[in-house]
């Protein structure tokens, strides 16, 4: 296979450079590198692109081109000749394609690595492989698959069925493959070269030695057997390509471009002997492609793939080209089978090619033109005919030509894969060379073994075939290298930005300068500087100059063709100029209006670059508004036409020889369920769980460390970043152009935002990480600094602390932390030092370092590391290992190999076990799940007996605990009354502190009568010298923190009292209520004093700043007459707190802040005594100690501060959440508790110790989107009915009523970024029910009797007859339920989880201790109101016995047995819900007002019931009236009371739909330098104009930058740009959002966080189908905006892949779906600005969600939940009670996240998360098989 050269107008004359030795310089040959079949793929996205920049005029002659330059000087240079205006017009002959006529028989098969490894050795002789069939492979060789070392060692080729596969031991394979390779190489004597070659090689630097393992197999090999040496040489070449060197070549003149190889020939005789080796007969040597051509056909329009194809390729093609619904009308293929073209019904033309580098397939950009012709087909057959490179579409049997198409060429495939082919001069003829760039280095494909090899370490870029058919690349950023002719240009001064070569070999170069319009024109790549022509590009249109304010063109990329220069500017616009018009160093450039591209791709398309195709046509690389790249050829009409889609493609590349790593066990960082990482040569690699191989992820890293929180962190360019494991797929284009999107998520680590605090100028050398909020760094100067970050914010909680150096000796090399956070430092001299956690956290004031004794042994320390449990391990130079336990070192065995494959996680096993316990399924075609349930004699959860606890344990847990203790129901009632009166004993510290703060405020107001200088001014006047600079900075930060905290508390109180609006502005309409003081006077817990006046007095006396917003707010409270009372210092009657104050804790927090500000004033006054007197370190240390006591002990440790930081505003919510936490401590601590019992049953453990371990392992294995919940619920109620006597109605009417009190507790663990999300919740509610029932006995009609009594039988007893009946009945009921909700949510890191679980399960921690665990606490409080109307019907066959005596009145007792069927349905349901979530970072308000919905749920069931009860007849006795009339006895009605036990089973389905709106307001962080750096990087990628690049460069290089000022500069420059294109739009939006955030931070206001409208569906068909009421609503009002279902349905219609994904989600049982909608960008930006202007509050914001024209679909989520619940229902005569506990798990089945651009109605792309994002098993197996064969799918 050879490169197809396009026709040129004139053959290019290449001038040969003189050789000093008068020898012919051969072309550049292949290089070498070590490789293995498990080699990992690198990032190849940038290969083969021409990204342009600007020229350099001044040049320096290179040594290589000196003689050539001298010859060029002697020749005259003519611009006319240079531009191609020759006197002759003779057209050259069209070159033929050298590869097109090569017969298949000439393609000799060559062996692969599998062949060599599969051949057994017997008596020193290698046997040919067995001719039995082998499974299809990516190579043509029939060798065995590379499964494991054992499969390849000492075994013949397996004769089993090739389709059978064995389990793959990846770990063993990776650890031993290099050993096997080295063993083979050790016993193989490679070919040798002659003496001349040896002398050349000896002068070169030797290659690094290949590491060998400790265990080697040595075997003597007879070197005289030629049939053995050739395959061993091939094996040597594939496994150690650095040993390859062809014989018979003169290498003296090309050694600069050849791999450096050691001399391998002992003498000339040996070399001659090696040359006489006969070729291997079986298999024959392969000289061409190592990739098997594909065989495919069409069968009735469906793609059929041959079994002979590689199985992996068949799988991938079946999932893409062969997927369901894809039909084809025509197919054509080359004779060799390496090139196929397919045409489908929609006009998509697919081009599939196999070549030496792999496989590639893509399709045309504009199928509509072809589809138009197909629509005229009239069922006539369609044929594709390839006529000398032209593709003809024929119709009918006679072959009527319908359409001529230009097929893509080899260059299109090369551009996609990054693998290029060119021809070089060989010994006998032209040879094909396959070239690529990897890691900025040129690599060549060794055709004998199919391995990529590198020549040298010189960096290369911009590899491409140019207009003259030659392969070029930019060498070392400043020189142009013609690889085909081996010419290197003289280096330019500036970096080459873009270059172009015409069909005649002329070269235009654009270099990267501040003026991107200078071009350098050369007659050839190796022209000397005197032959270069420099000129500038200027705009020919004067009006365009005026509009731009710049006469020159800001060029980004260029192309040359037919004497014309094409250029794309920074805006992606196209220009063209005639080179003949160059005058005075200027070339006028005219805009090329591209109406055709605009029509096809929209007005916002961009020209990103150019390339020349196989036909010599210039192609523009056009990016459309969906970010897809298209190759568009230039036609005769001077227009670029839609060509080929280069983004929607399938690329499989050969990666053999690239990125082969085999890390040692100690080099692997194990992240548990998230996989494994390693750092090799500054590059982070991850073990890909999909391909089961190591893959590169991030380069340029100094260190990779595992934090104590379980996360991975890197040190890169002086910054610390957490590596977040990817959980979503790459972006998938919305629309139909995503044929080759194979959704799959890989566990690739991606660096997050740099952790705050560390400055790049510190040049950190090593890190030790506690978690994302706490880390230490070792600087280049040897200082160790600790950083404490405020959780959830980009601010330091306190300034960085530099650790004391006392006790340290030597130069520090690395630092580590153990599991107790003790710090270890190792020096370059091999000494180890330790400092305890409590000491290093104090910084310089902490104690010194302790030098540890050296481990035993004579060898020195090599390194310190920590094991999986963070125990320090010292590794000596001799490899021995010692673990530190206490103060002594203990020998440790060598590290065990890390388990690289994660396997089945514990959480997956538990989920599968619970899922097995669920009974039910999906009703076909409905989207509804039907679920079964059963109960037996009051015991619930009996539908499945696979997970069940013992009967005795259930009785003890849910009914009766046989002890002498007070029964639990009685204790609960008593505790509830006690807690309501006096609060919780565990919260007494909070109650006491609230009273103490009142007294402190009063005391401070007595001391401070007059005003004094504000605190900020006092601090500005302090001078502690250099020694006290850090202390002064700490004090200033604390002052700012106090003022901001007090201001936020005052705003919160003002909003609640009504004196401020919801957006924090002054409420001009506020009037103090007249009756408020009178009402508060009746509250004995209130002090009656005005808190506003007391606070205003304290702040006025000790103001925090000159323009204090706090002081202004409090003054406004006073002047507005706000009488804000507070509780007494001492609460009477033992109540401890005021339970009726809804802002008690907020008031206490405000008092705390104000009192602390006053004390800080006093502290600063004392500190001022030594200010300006250069205080000594002891004085500074004393001040620091006093300051720490004030900040840490009095403020941070204050319980009011701690609980208000969690979001609590009053005591009732705090007590409710305290109760929830305590309930679960008791639930897990007591083994007889229902929660403990259910959890142990599900997890299959015995006892609390094993429960703690299994629960820890399960929770740590939770993946993103997974959660585990524990529930505890009980209820009690009263219900009754009355049967009135109504004679005129044939059926009875039975009214009923009931009331139920319920309480539920819930504990949930869910996976979140950086840890686990923990939520404690308590819900309490009351439900009232009204019902009316009726029924009738059908048995008399069936038996022919008149009444039920006539069917009675006395066969059992003469006195107590059995009365059978067959009764049908119906009930109409309504109920209203009100529920109060309380919850506490926080985040736990993985290192905190074990102690958390231990304290909860063993009961060693109090509820307050557990509540203080974790970070980012949030308190939620809300209420829910639900109204339902239900209808039910039942039919029962009953038999009752009246067990009272006949005639007994008024009470009768009855025993009844019955069996029957029942059905119920919800007719109407309405729901309203409100909740507020408050935390230190912000608050969220959610509201759900759902209109009445109909037919929401249904239930059918069967039961067998035994019941007994009593009925009381209300009888009015007979009486005689005054007139003597006798009134008979009258029975108004009957009052029944029954209890029952039954066995029942039911099927239920839910069709509910609910909607809610949530608005989050969060505290704004000031913009940081990290934010600016990321913003500059983003803007720089998309704004290439000179003004923007100059601004961005100047900001990036500023010294001591101010982020706020830099943000203003960026805003001024970019806010006025007319943004076109989605990339620029998103970049500018990021800038605007930062500007809004900074504005909110400066004004101490809250910014808008998330604002969304969410619709929840129980019926998944409602995702894309409207309900009946929506249909009717739109029928009568067509102007209504489309519903979310309509929008999703339209997106599915336009995207078959999205349709398939959603339909797959809808097919999952036990699921619920949610659709989130958000404000469109423009409206959101306006809203954010209005919020900061004080014009819009939360109420006005909620109104925007009522109009769906303002919204866009944000995401679609489908989640699945499985559960196990056990309990007991205990009905009595009138009272009923229930008690239950359960464990449930949820997981994210799939989330589809949509991304938008400038078009806010149609998403541009989407990503997938959850289970649906995982590759299906077939694709996963295919990708894994590709990896084993050395191939990878390119993203």
From Swiss-Prot:
Organism: Pantoea stewartii subsp. stewartii (Erwinia stewartii)
Location of region: Disordered: 1-53, 86-108, 123-163
Function according to Swiss-Prot or TrEMBL: Major virulence factor that may function as a water- and solute-permeable channel dedicated to creating osmotic/water potential perturbation and a water- and nutrient-rich apoplast in which bacteria multiply within the infected plant tissues.
InterPro entries linked: AvrE_T3Es
Motif (WxxxE 2): 840-844
Name assigned to this protein: Type III effector WtsE
Biased composition (Basic and acidic residues): 147-163
Phylogenetic lineage: Bacteria, Pseudomonadati, Pseudomonadota, Gammaproteobacteria, Enterobacterales
Single GO cellular component term: host cell
């Amino acid at each position: 296979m050879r490169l197809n050269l396009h026709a040129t107008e004139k053959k290019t004359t290449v001038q040969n450079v003189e050789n000093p030795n008068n020898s012919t310089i051969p072309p550049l040959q292949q290089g070498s590198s070590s490789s293995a079949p498990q080699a990992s793929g690198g990032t190849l996205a940038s290969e083969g692109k021409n990204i342009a920049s600007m020229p350099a005029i001044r040049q320096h002659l290179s040594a290589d081109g000196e003689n050539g330059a001298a010859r060029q000087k002697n020749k005259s240079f003519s611009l006319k000749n240079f531009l191609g205006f020759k006197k002759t017009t003779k057209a050259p002959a069209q070159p033929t394609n050298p590869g097109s006529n090569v017969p298949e028989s000439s393609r000799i098969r060559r062996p692969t690595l599998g062949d060599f490894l599969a051949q057994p050795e017997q008596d020193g002789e290698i046997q040919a492989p067995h001719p039995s069939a082998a499974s299809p492979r990516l190579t043509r060789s029939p060798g065995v698959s590379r499964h494991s070392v054992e499969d390849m060692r000492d075994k013949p080729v397996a004769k089993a069925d090739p389709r059978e596969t064995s389990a793959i031991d990846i770990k063993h394979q990776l650890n031993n493959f290099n050993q096997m390779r080295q063993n083979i190489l050790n016993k193989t004597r490679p070919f040798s070269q002659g003496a001349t070659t040896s002398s050349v090689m000896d002068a070169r630097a030797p290659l690094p030695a290949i590491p060998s393992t400790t265990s080697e197999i040595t075997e003597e090999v007879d070197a005289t057997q030629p049939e053995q040496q050739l395959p061993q040489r091939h094996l040597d070449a594939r496994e150690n390509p650095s040993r390859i060197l062809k014989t018979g070549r003169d290498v003296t003149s090309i050694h600069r471009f050849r791999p450096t190889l050691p001399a391998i020939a002992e003498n000339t005789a040996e070399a001659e002997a090696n040359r006489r080796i006969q070729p291997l007969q079986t298999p024959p040597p392969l000289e061409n492609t190592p990739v098997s051509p594909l065989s495919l056909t069409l069968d009735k329009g469906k793609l059929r793939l041959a079994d002979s194809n590689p199985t992996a390729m068949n799988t991938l093609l079946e999932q893409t080209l062969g997927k369901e619904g894809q039909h084809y009308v025509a197919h054509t293929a080359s004779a060799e089978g390496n090139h196929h073209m397919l045409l489908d019904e929609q006009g998509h033309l697919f081009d599939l090619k196999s070549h030496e580098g792999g496989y590639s397939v893509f399709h045309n950009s504009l199928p509509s033109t072809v589809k138009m012709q197909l629509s005229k087909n009239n069922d006539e057959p369609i044929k594709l005919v390839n006529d000398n490179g032209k593709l003809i579409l024929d119709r009918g049997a006679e072959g009527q030509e319908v359409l001529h198409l230009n097929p893509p060429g080899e260059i299109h495939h090369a551009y996609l894969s990054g693998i290029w082919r060119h021809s070089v001069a060989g010994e006998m003829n032209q040879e094909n060379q396959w070239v690529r760039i990897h890691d900025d280095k040129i690599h060549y494909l060794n055709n004998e073994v199919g391995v990529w090899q590198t020549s040298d370490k010189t960096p290369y870029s911009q590899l491409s075939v140019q207009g003259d058919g030659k392969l070029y690349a930019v060498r070392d950023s400043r020189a142009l290298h013609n690889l085909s002719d081996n010419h290197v240009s003289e280096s330019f001064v500036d970096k080459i930005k873009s270059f172009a070569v015409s069909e005649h070999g002329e070269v235009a170069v654009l270099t990267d300068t501040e003026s991107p319009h200078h071009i350098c024109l050369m007659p050839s790549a190796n022209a000397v500087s005197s032959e270069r022509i420099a000129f500038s590009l200027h705009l020919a249109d004067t009006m365009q100059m005026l509009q731009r304010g710049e006469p020159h063109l800001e060029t980004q990329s260029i192309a040359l063709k037919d004497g014309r220069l094409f250029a794309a500017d920074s805006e992606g616009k196209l220009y063209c100029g005639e080179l003949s018009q160059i005058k005075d160093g200027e070339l006028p450039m005219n805009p090329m209006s591209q109406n055709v591209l605009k029509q096809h791709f929209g007005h916002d398309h961009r020209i990103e670059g150019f390339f020349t195709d196989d036909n010599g046509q210039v192609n523009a690389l056009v990016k459309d508004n969906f970010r897809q790249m298209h190759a568009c050829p230039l036609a005769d009409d001077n227009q670029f036409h839609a060509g080929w889609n280069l983004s929607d493609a399938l690329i499989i590349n050969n990666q053999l020889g690239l990125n082969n790593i085999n890390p040692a066990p100690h080099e692997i960082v194990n992240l548990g369920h998230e996989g494994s990482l390693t750092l090799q040569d500054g590059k982070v690699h991850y073990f890909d769980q999909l391909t089961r191989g190591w893959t590169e992820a991030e380069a340029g890293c100094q260190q990779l460390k595992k934090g104590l929180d379980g996360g991975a962190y890197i040190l890169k360019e002086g910054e610390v970043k957490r590596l977040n494991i990817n959980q979503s797929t790459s972006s998938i284009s919305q629309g139909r152009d995503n044929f080759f999107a194979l959704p799959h998520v890989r566990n690739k680590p991606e660096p997050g935002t740099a952790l705050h605090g560390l400055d790049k100028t510190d040049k950190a050398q090593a890190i030790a990480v506690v978690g994302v909020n706490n880390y230490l760094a070792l600087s280049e100067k040897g200082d160790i600094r600790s950083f404490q970050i405020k959780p959830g914010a980009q601010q330091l909680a306190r300034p960085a602390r530099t650790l004391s150096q006392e006790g340290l000796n030597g130069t520090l090399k690395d630092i580590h932390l153990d599991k107790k956070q003790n710090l270890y430092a190792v020096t370059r001299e091999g000494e180890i030092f330790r400092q305890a956690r409590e000491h290093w956290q104090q910084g310089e004031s902490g104690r010194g370092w302790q030098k540890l004794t050296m481990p035993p042994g004579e060898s020195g320390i090599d390194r310190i590391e920590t094991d999986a449990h963070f125990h320090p391990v010292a590794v000596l130079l001799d490899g021995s290992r010692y673990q530190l336990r206490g103060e002594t070192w203990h020998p440790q065995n060598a590290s065990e190999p890390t388990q690289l494959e994660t396997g089945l996680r514990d959480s997956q096993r538990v989920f599968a076990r619970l899922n097995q316990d669920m009974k039910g399924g999906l009703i076909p075609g409905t989207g509804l799940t039907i679920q079964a349930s059963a109960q037996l004699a009051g015991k619930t959860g009996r539908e499945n007996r696979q997970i069940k606890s013992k009967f005795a344990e259930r009785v003890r847990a849910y009914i009766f605990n046989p002890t002498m203790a007070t029964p639990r129901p009685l204790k609960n009632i008593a505790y509830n009354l006690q807690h309501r009166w006096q609060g919780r004993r565990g919260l007494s510290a909070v109650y006491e502190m609230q009273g103490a703060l009142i007294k402190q405020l009063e005391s401070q107001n007595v001391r401070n009568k007059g005003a004094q200088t504000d605190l900020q001014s006092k601090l500005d006047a302090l001078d502690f010298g250099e020694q006290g600079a850090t202390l002064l900075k700490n004090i200033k930060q604390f002052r700012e923190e106090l003022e901001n905290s007090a201001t936020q508390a005052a705003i919160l109180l003002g909003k609640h009292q009504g004196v401020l609006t919801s957006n924090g502005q002054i409420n001009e309409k506020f009037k103090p209520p007249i009756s408020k003081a009178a009402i508060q006077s009746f509250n004995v817990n209130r002090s009656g004093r005005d808190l506003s006046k007391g606070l205003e007095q304290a702040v006025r006396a000790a103001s925090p700043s000159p323009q204090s917003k706090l002081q202004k707010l409090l003054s406004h409270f006073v002047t507005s007459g706000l009488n804000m009372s507070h509780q007494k210092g001492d609460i009477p009657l033992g109540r401890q707190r005021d339970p009726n104050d809804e802002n008690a804790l907020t008031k206490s927090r405000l008092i705390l802040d104000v009192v602390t500000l006053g004390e800080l004033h006093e502290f600063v006054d004392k500190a001022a005594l030594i200010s300006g007197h250069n205080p000594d370190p002891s004085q500074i240390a004393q001040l620091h100690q006093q300051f720490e006591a004030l900040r840490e002990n009095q403020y941070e440790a204050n319980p009011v501060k701690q609980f208000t930081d969690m979001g609590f505003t009053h005591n009732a919510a705090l007590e409710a959440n305290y109760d929830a936490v305590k309930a679960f401590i008791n639930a897990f601590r007591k083994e007889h508790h229902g929660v403990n019992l259910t959890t142990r049953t599900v997890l299959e453990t015995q006892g609390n110790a094993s429960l703690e371990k299994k629960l820890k392992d399960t929770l740590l294995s939770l993946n993103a989107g997974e959660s585990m919940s524990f529930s505890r619920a009980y209820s009690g109620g009263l219900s009754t009915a009355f049967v009135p006597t109504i004679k005129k109605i044939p059926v009875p009417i039975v009214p009923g009523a009931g009331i139920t009190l319920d309480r539920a507790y819930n504990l949930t663990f869910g996976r979140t970024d950086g840890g686990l999300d923990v939520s404690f919740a308590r819900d309490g509610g009351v439900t009232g029910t009204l019902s009316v029932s009726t029924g009738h006995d059908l048995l008399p009609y069936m038996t022919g009797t008149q009444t039920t009594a006539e069917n009675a039988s006395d066969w059992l007893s003469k006195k107590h007859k059995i009365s059978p009946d067959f009764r049908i009945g119906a009930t109409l009921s309504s109920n209203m339920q009100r529920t109060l909700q309380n919850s506490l949510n926080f985040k736990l890191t993985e290192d905190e989880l074990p102690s958390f679980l231990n304290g909860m399960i063993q009961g060693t921690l109090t509820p307050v201790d557990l509540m203080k665990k974790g970070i980012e606490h949030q308190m939620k409080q809300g209420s829910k109101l639900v109204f339902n109307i239900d209808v039910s019907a039942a039919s029962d066959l009953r038999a009752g016995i009246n067990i009272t005596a006949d005639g007994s009145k008024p009470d009768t007792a009855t025993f009844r047995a019955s069996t029957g069927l029942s059905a119920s349905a919800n007719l109407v349901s309405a729901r309203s819900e409100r909740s507020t979530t408050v935390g230190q970072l912000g608050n969220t308000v959610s509201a759900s007002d759902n209109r009445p919905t109909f037919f929401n749920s249904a239930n059918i069931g069967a039961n067998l019931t035994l019941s007994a009860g009593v009925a009381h007849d209300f009888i009015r006795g007979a009486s005689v009236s005054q007139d003597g009339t006798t009134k008979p006895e009258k029975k108004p009605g009957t009052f029944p009371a029954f209890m029952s036990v039954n066995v029942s089973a039911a099927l239920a389905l839910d069709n509910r739909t609910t909607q809610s709106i949530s608005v989050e307001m969060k505290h704004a962080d000031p913009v940081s330098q990290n934010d600016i750096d990321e913003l500059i990087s983003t803007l720089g990628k998309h704004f290439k104009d000179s003004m923007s690049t100059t601004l961005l460069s100047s900001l990036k290089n500023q010294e001591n930058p101010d982020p706020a000022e830099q943000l203003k500069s960026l805003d001024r420059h970019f806010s006025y740009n007319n943004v076109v294109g989605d990339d620029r739009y998103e970049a500018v939006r990021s800038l605007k959002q930062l500007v809004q955030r900074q504005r909110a931070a400066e004004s101490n206001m809250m910014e808008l966080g998330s604002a969304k409208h969410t619709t929840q569906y129980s019926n998944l068909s409602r995702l894309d189908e409207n309900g009946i009421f929506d249909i009717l609503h739109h029928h009568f009002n067509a102007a209504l905006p489309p519903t979310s279902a309509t929008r999703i349905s339209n997106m599915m219609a336009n995207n078959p892949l999205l349709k398939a994904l959603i339909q797959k989600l809808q097919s999952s049982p036990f699921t619920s779906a949610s659709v989130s909608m958000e404000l469109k960008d423009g409206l959101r930006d306006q809203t954010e600005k209005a919020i900061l202007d004080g014009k819009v509050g939360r109420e006005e914001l909620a109104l925007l969600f009522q109009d769906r024209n303002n919204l866009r679909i944000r995401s679609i989520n489908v989640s699945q939940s499985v559960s196990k619940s056990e309990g007991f229902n205990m009905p009595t005569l009138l009272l009923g009670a229930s008690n239950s506990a359960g464990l449930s798990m949820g997981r994210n089945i799939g989330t589809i996240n949509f991304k938008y651009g400038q078009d806010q109605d149609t998403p541009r792309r989407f990503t997938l998360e959850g289970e649906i994002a995982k590759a299906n098993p077939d694709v996963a197996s295919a990708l894994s098989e590709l990896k084993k064969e050395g191939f990878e799918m390119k993203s």
